[in-house]
Structure formats: structure tokens, C-alpha cells
Regions:
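RNA-binding accessory domains that recognize and position tRNA/RNA substrates
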Residues: 1-16, 41-42
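Cysteine-based protein phosphatase catalytic domain of the PTP/DSP
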Residues: 18-112
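A phosphate-binding catalytic loop at a beta-strand-loop-alpha-helix junction
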Residues: 110-123
Length: 123
């Protein structure tokens, strides 16, 4: 009997909402090269990317260039610092609540929002 072990890959799971979408994905650089994953992310044409991970986690995935590269493509980037397997603290929750109007406006205006953490499963 042969057992096939699948390698995790960078994949964006999208949910279409009216004319916009919400996507969920891992950190670019987590499963393959940052540049390959970044290209796949921007091919989805998001207007907004929200990273829910810590700076050390971003460093471990070689993703510290993510904000700058998104900015250069005029894609808004927001960072909510949430530890893996934890709930957001009060500050992070306030930041999330302040982002909600931007995210809703983007989605219901026909744009795309991609949320990422390290593994792409959610915090």
C-alpha cells in the first residue's frame, strides 16, 4: 500500500459576496518562496490585505517585505498582531473594529479583501 503525503501549498480560499470577495490564505513564504506566493496573492487582485500574525512569524516566513510590496502595487495593508491559537487582545479587537467599515466598503463596492495568518486557517 502506498501512502501519498501531500505537501502544503499556498492557496487562497475565496468567498464571493455580491460583487466582491473575501479570501483566506497562509503567509506568503510559509510553504514555498515568498516571491512565488506573493505573485499568486496579487493575481487575485485584492484591494486590501489584512495580516493577522506577529512580526516574528512574518520574519520566519521571510514575509517582512509584504507591506512594502503591497504598497508599491497600491494595495492597502493592515496588520493585526495576534498570537497563534490566541484571541485578539483589547487593542487588536479595537483595531479590527476600526477596519470593519473599510473592509465592508471594499467588499460591497466590488473589491477584494484577503486575510492571512501563518497557516491560512485563521487565528
Amino acid at each position: 500500500m502506498e501512502i501519498e503525503i501531500s505537501k502544503s501549498v499556498f492557496e487562497i480560499v475565496k468567498i464571493e459576496i455580491e460583487s466582491g470577495f473575501v479570501g483566506l490564505c497562509p503567509m506568503p513564504g510559509k510553504f514555498s518562496s515568498f516571491d512565488e506566493d506573493f505573485l499568486q496573492l496579487v493575481k487575485e487582485l485584492p484591494q486590501v490585505v489584512v495580516t493577522c500574525a506577529t512580526q516574528p512569524e512574518m520574519m520566519a516566513c521571510s514575509a517582512t517585505r509584504l507591506p512594502e510590496k503591497l504598497y508599491n502595487l497600491e494595495i492597502q495593508w493592515f496588520h493585526i498582531d495576534v498570537e497563534d491559537f490566541q484571541v485578539p487582545d483589547e487593542f487588536s479587537e479595537e483595531k479590527w473594529n476600526s477596519l470593519l467599515p473599510i473592509l465592508k466598503e471594499t467588499i460591497f463596492g466590488g473589491g477584494g479583501v484577503i486575510l492571512n495568518c501563518v497557516g491560512g486557517c485563521g487565528r
